[in-house]
């Protein structure tokens, strides 16, 4: 039906609004990052020391070389190495290696498999039994501290000779017997006063002993004399002998061995 235009005068317009869309939810926070796994511990160094002496036994008047060998047998650098020398108090020292003071030697760092060698020369002047030691310390790692101390026994011998018998007349051959000499070294026998007959040197056997002979020349002088044994590696040693004249028979002239 037709509505008169005048009847629309009281109508108002209505605007409809849709409700706002809900905001999207905030994303969940990311889980914290896992810390990196700890690195495995690095390898340890393995420094150790070994000591030896040559010759062993040693001999009065000779030389004994003591060798210290420090070696790193493990897989890391060995650092801060010091070696304490345990040398016998009763034996004079002829030479010390460089870098040693007060019985302690500073050593260079050693890579895996590397070694450092130190040599000490002893000059024994008396017979004795003793020990030689070496003690190693480090400021770095050490996989095995059980090889940081090395100890060896050392014996010093005093060579000596005797004549059997101790009395003889011109033309007599006396026996000279030695003990505690370096095996295999040539030992020259001489006597003074008097003339020493030419003879090959004595050679001590494995136990350091020898038996040699000295001839008293027929026209040689009588009286006391000194037999001397000398050679490399020891100080000369002596024994007394008496040359007699006339009809005196030296003891053991017939039955001596």
Label each residue range with its predicted role.
Residues 1-23, 27, 34-65, 73-84, ...:
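Extracytoplasmic/secretory-pathway segments with low complexity and glycosylation-like composition
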């Amino acid at each position: 039906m037709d509505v008169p235009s005048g009847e629309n005068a009281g109508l108002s317009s209505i605007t409809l609004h849709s409700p706002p869309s809900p905001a999207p939810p905030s994303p969940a926070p990311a889980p914290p990052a896992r810390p990196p796994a700890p690195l495995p511990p690095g390898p340890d160094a393995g420094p150790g020391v070994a000591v030896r002496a040559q010759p062993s036994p040693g001999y009065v008047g000779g030389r004994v070389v003591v060798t210290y060998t420090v070696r790193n047998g493990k897989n890391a650098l060995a650092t801060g190495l010091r070696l304490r020398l345990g040398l016998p108090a009763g034996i004079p020292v002829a030479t010390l290696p460089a870098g040693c003071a007060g019985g302690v030697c500073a050593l260079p760092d050693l890579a895996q498999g590397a070694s450092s060698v130190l040599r000490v020369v002893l000059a024994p002047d008396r017979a004795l039994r003793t020990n030689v030691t070496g003690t190693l310390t480090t400021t770095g790692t050490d996989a095995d501290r059980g090889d940081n101390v090395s100890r060896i026994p050392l014996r010093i011998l005093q060579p000596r000779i005797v004549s059997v018998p101790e009395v003889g007349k011109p033309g007599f051959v006396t026996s000279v017997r030695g003990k505690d000499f370096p095996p295999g070294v040539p030992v020259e026998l001489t006597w003074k006063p008097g003339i020493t007959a030419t003879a090959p040197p004595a050679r001590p056997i494995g136990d350091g002993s020898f038996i040699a002979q000295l001839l008293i020349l027929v026209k040689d002088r009588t009286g006391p004399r000194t037999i001397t044994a000398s050679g490399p590696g020891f100080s000369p040693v002596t024994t007394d002998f008496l040359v007699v004249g006339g009809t005196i028979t030296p003891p053991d002239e017939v039955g001596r061995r």
